Amino acid sequence: MYYSFFEIFSIGVGPSSSHTVGPMRAAKRYIDNLHKKELFDKVERVEATLYGSLALTGFGHGTVKAIVYGFMGLEAEAIDPEKPYVSAVERDKILHLGQERPIPFDIEKDVIFEKQTFLPEHSNGMRFRAYDRDGNVLLDEVYFSVGGGTIARQDEISRRVEREPYKVPFDYSSAAELLEICEKEGLSIADVVLINEAALRPHDEVMEGIGKIHRVMQASIDRGMKAKGTLPGGLNIERRAHEIYCRLEQKFRDNDYDPLLMIDWINLWGFAVAEE
C-alpha cells in the first residue's frame, strides 16, 4: 500500500515522533475539542497526566515541552525555535491557553507523572483534564501516541481500521516493486513519487509542501551545527554537532580531501537535526 510523502516526512517538534510530535498534536486537539464543545471560555485550569513510557521519559524526551505547546494551541510549523515558550511558562506560571486566555499553570503541579501505570491500550498514554472556577471537571479525555506522530483518543484506539488505499498511478509495497516500476516506465524514484503525489493533491501544493519541509530541515541543520552547550531535557548531555562541524571545517581548510569525508558530513547533519 502506498504511503504519501507527507505521511513519512512532516514538520514536528523533536526529538521523537511518539514522545513529542504525538503529545503536542494530542494536547492541541484537546484544546480544539474544548472550543467545539463550547467549554473553552469556562476553563480556569488544565492538567496533564502522563502514563507509562511517556511518564518515564517525560522531561528528557521533551514530552512536557510538547504538551505545553499543544495547550498553547501552537502548530509545529508556526513555532519559532528562538522563542522561550516553555521557560516563560515555567517562570511566570501562566499559560496562554489556545493562544487566547492566560490561566495559571505550574508545570511541577499540573503535569503529573504516573511512571508505574501503563494503560492497557498502549504504553504512550496521556490524560487531559480541564476544570472550571469551582473545580468541576469540564472535559476529561485520554489520548495515545501510537507512533510516527499518529494519535488516537481512547474511544478511537479500539476501533482503529486501516484507511482505504490511495488511488495512485504507481502503487507499490516494497523497494523491489518500486525499482521494477522505474525500470519498466523509464522513470527515476523521484519521478514516480512526484507523479503519485500529484494524483493526491495539486502539483503546486506538492512542490510547496516539499519546499517547506526542505527549508525547515536545512534550518535545523544550520542551527544544530552552530549550537553549543548541553541539550535541553535535564540530562546534561553535551551537544556533539558543533564539535564535529569545527573538525570537518578544519579538514576542509587543510585541503584534506578524504573520499570518505562526505560520510562524515552526512553524519554531522544527522547529529545537527537530532540535537535540534
Positions of the model-derived regions?
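Short, hydrophobic/aliphatic alpha-helical segments
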Residues: M1-G12, E47-L50, I263-E276
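Conserved phosphate/anionic-ligand binding catalytic regions in large, soluble enzymes, centered on
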Residues: F9-A27, G60, E276
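N-terminal ordered "arm"
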Residues: S16-R45
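Generic secondary-structure signature for well-ordered alpha-helical cores
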Residues: D32-L39, M72-E77, R133-N136, R215-A227, ...
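Flexible, glycine/charged-enriched surface loops at secondary-structure junctions
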Residues: E38-R45, A78-P81, G224-I237
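Beta-sandwich/jelly-roll carbohydrate-recognition scaffolds of carbohydrate-active enzymes
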Residues: D41, V46-V192
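N-terminal amphipathic, basic-rich helices that act as targeting or association modules
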Residues: S174-S220, G224
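Accessory "access/gating" subregions that flank catalytic or transport cores
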Residues: D204-E276
